[in-house]
Amino acid sequence: MKMIQEGDILIFEDGTELKVDNVEYLCHDGRTIQYVEGTIGKDITYTYVENDVASSINGLNGRIIKCLRP
């Protein structure tokens, strides 16, 4: 998957759609991790994305299957 950008819509395995409002790139031990802030409907969520998998303690988790770029 390409690098995530503001305005992208991320589609997850369960059908959840996350509209990306902001993204930051973090480098850690030679890995690039994307910190994504976005909205699902009207709810704001934050998550970390690495290798097309989103994970956070109390945010969005799961595999991203598609990235739509309007």
Regions found by a protein language model. Name each.
Residues 13-14, 28:
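Conserved "cap/hinge" positions at secondary-structure junctions
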Residues 27-39:
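Short, solvent-exposed secondary-structure boundary/capping segments
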